[in-house]
UniProtKB/Swiss-Prot annotation:
Cofactor note: Binds 1 Zn(2+) ion per subunit.
Record bears the keyword Metal-binding: yes
Family that this chain belongs to: Belongs to the MacroD-type family. Zn-Macro subfamily.
Lineage: Bacteria, Bacillati, Bacillota, Bacilli, Lactobacillales
Binding-site positions, Zn(2+): C112, H117, C119
UniProt xrefs under InterPro entries: Macro_dom (IPR002589), Macro_dom-like (IPR043472)
Catalyzed reactions per annotation: 4-O-(ADP-D-ribosyl)-L-aspartyl-[protein] + H2O = L-aspartyl-[protein] + ADP-D-ribose + H(+)
Cofactor(s) the record lists: Zn(2+)
Biological role stated in the UniProt entry: ADP-ribosylhydrolase that specifically reverses the SirTM-mediated mono-ADP-ribosylation at an asparatate residue of GcvH-L, by releasing ADP-ribose from the target protein. May play a role in the regulation of the response to host-induced oxidative stress.
Entry protein name: Protein-ADP-ribose hydrolase
GO MF entry, a single one: poly(ADP-ribose) glycohydrolase activity
A Pfam short name: Macro
Binding sites annotated in the UniProt record for ADP-D-ribose: D92, I93, N106, C119, I120, D121, S212, T213, G214, E215, F216
Length: 270
């Protein structure tokens, strides 16, 4: 069985041969981390076009190795809160073995094309595998227009431990600008649409990232308040959804502190 180092070399060779990302046509690195970065940069920039079976077989083997390199996080590993159906997980959302994770997508719904970018959209698409971009392209082709803010779409999670990914596009906030009622409602719609879709798909566990708080600039405090209030209100309006366990995933210490505070019943964002 080829090593991850060798698999990366073969994948890079195939991607460079395509010449779809010729700006990254450079010698094959000798260091593992450099190969990882080059492969990720190439696949990040690659258009949503069919891939060869040879490439997909290599990618499957490489991502299977990646998947075996960590212990997935289940609901029972998550932090309990004062609400029986709400949990917290501080860490990498890619490691969650739940029915679905929520991806903060953009209006193209094809993932992030910036090489090695640090956004959640890039991380999820890279390690779910390139089939995810193709699946999203099929959705967008059928839809025939950009994805609207506050909607939600469901795909397989492919190589991630989760079974599915729910993609939603949140509102943008210019730095220093006040959060208008319209944008607050658009963010709330992201949560409602994702919850509605999860129930429609028969899911029993759903992990939310902090939608719009990264590249889209939504203030973290207001975003956390909206997220929790929206989920609690949705639960009250959908008593039949008691079987749906909801996890709030935090990645920064600031987000964790906010959710820790607001998920105490005496501080429930009212």
């Amino acid at each position: 069985m080829p090593s991850s180092f060798d698999l990366l070399g073969e994948m890079i060779g195939l991607l460079q041969t395509e010449q779809l990302t010729s700006s990254l046509a450079c010698p094959l690195p000798n260091a593992l981390t450099k190969r990882q970065d080059l492969w990720r940069a190439l696949i990040n920039q690659r258009p949503a076009l069919p891939l060869s079976k040879d490439y997909l077989n290599l990618e499957d083997a490489y991502l299977d190795d990646w998947r075996a390199s960590f212990v997935p996080v289940s609901v029972k590993d998550c932090q309990k809160t004062n609400y029986t159906s709400l949990f917290l997980y501080h860490g990498d959302i890619r490691y969650l073995a739940v029915d679905a994770i929520v991806n903060a997508a953009n209006s193209e719904l094809l993932g992030c094309f910036i090489p090695n970018h640090g956004c959640i959209d890039n991380a999820i698409h890279t390690f779910a595998g390139s089939r995810l971009r193709l699946a999203c392209q099929a959705i967008m082709t059928e839809q025939g227009r950009k994805e609207a803010i506050g909607q939600a779409k469901l795909t397989s999670a492919y190589h991630l431990p989760a079974s599915y990914i729910i993609h939603t596009v949140g509102p943008r906030i210019t730095k220093g600008r006040h959060v208008s009622p319209i944008r607050a409602d658009l963010l709330a719609r992201c949560y409602r649409s994702s919850l509605d879709l999860a129930v429609k798909a028969g899911l029993t566990s759903l992990a939310f990232c902090s939608i719009s708080t990264g590249e889209f600039g939504f203030p973290k405090k207001e975003a956390a308040q909206i997220a929790i209030k929206t989920v609690l209100k949705w639960q009250a309006e959908h008593p039949e959804s008691k079987t749906l366990t909801i996890i709030f995933n935090t990645f920064t210490s600031e987000d964790k502190a906010l959710y820790d505070t607001y998920l105490q019943k005496e501080n429930n964002c009212e």
